[in-house]
Amino acid sequence: MAVTINTLREYKQKGEAFSALTSYDATFAQVVSEAGVDVILIGDSLGMVLQGHDSTLPVTMDQMVYHTSCVARGNKGALIMADMPFMSYGTVADALDNAAELMRAGAHMVKLEGTDWMKDTIEALSERGVPVCAHLGLTPQFVNKFGGYKVQGRDEKAAEAMIEHACELEAAGADLILLECVPAPLAARITQAVKAPVIGIGAGSDTDGQVLVLHDMLGVTTGRKPRFVKNFLAETDSIPEAIAAYAQAVKARTFPAEEHTFKA
């Protein structure tokens, strides 16, 4: 049975964790979905892991549409979420046009990075039938504003602001919240504060779901490994087995463990 946003809501209500993983092509989309992963994210992370850039900023709408269409052809029942790349949703009009392209390519949901300035955009998309995931915390498209890739929400003022933003974006129509590089206690507070399912990456084990970049969890990413990453291929004999092990570990809440978590 195909995973939908209602499936994720039911998981949250039952306290069952769900898994998400990036994919960028038809072959991996099939492998990931058949391994039991609930959500496939076509991330603008492709700019780094596929194209070799040092950020996600160079990724274009045409590239996101292309990879979304590839994933949609290979997918076997996972919910497909596509990133809207840098400045593709700077205005409501741009967001509507570009989200339509991704939905036509096969996405079931789009993901936007930002805070309360996105309320009008999320409301406009939601009213027109486009499900939205709001990405808070470390938002890679803002790397130049942050001065690097850093944990967000470490002081109480920033934490309270993030909780407020999550509630405001849910009220505007966000169906899903994604928290990246957020202290685990704050992620737990946000997960409890909103009715929408919350996906974490580097946000502890108390969120409703977990997401990783495919290349990271297979141990093939070069350079510095983020703290929240685990190499599942190192413990298995094949890529499909590694992906299935990841999905099972998320479901059992054995991943992320303490060593993958930011406490403060």
Curated annotation (Swiss-Prot):
Compartments, as annotated in UniProt: Cytoplasm
Signal peptide: none
TM stretches of this protein: none
A molecular-function term among this protein's GO annotations: 3-methyl-2-oxobutanoate hydroxymethyltransferase activity
Keywords: Cytoplasm, Magnesium, Metal-binding, Pantothenate biosynthesis, Transferase
Cofactor or coenzyme needed: Mg(2+)
Catalytic activity: 3-methyl-2-oxobutanoate + (6R)-5,10-methylene-5,6,7,8-tetrahydrofolate + H2O = 2-dehydropantoate + (6S)-5,6,7,8-tetrahydrofolate
Pathway the protein contributes to: Cofactor biosynthesis; (R)-pantothenate biosynthesis; (R)-pantoate from 3-methyl-2-oxobutanoate: step 1/2
Binding of Mg(2+), residues: 44, 83, 113
Cofactor: record remark: Binds 1 Mg(2+) ion per subunit.
One GO term (biological process): pantothenate biosynthetic process
Active site: 180 (proton acceptor)
Documented EC number(s): 2.1.2.11
Annotated binding of 3-methyl-2-oxobutanoate, by residue: 44-45, 83, 111
InterPro entries: Pantoate_hydroxy_MeTrfase, Pyrv/PenolPyrv_kinase-like_dom, Pyrv_kinase-like_dom_sf
Gene Ontology CC terms: cytoplasm
One Pfam family here: Pantoate_transf
Known partners and oligomeric status: Homodecamer; pentamer of dimers.
Similarity remark: Belongs to the PanB family.
Summary of the function given for this chain in its UniProt record: Catalyzes the reversible reaction in which hydroxymethyl group from 5,10-methylenetetrahydrofolate is transferred onto alpha-ketoisovalerate to form ketopantoate.
Record protein name field: 3-methyl-2-oxobutanoate hydroxymethyltransferase
Organism of provenance: Marinobacter nauticus (strain ATCC 700491 / DSM 11845 / VT8)
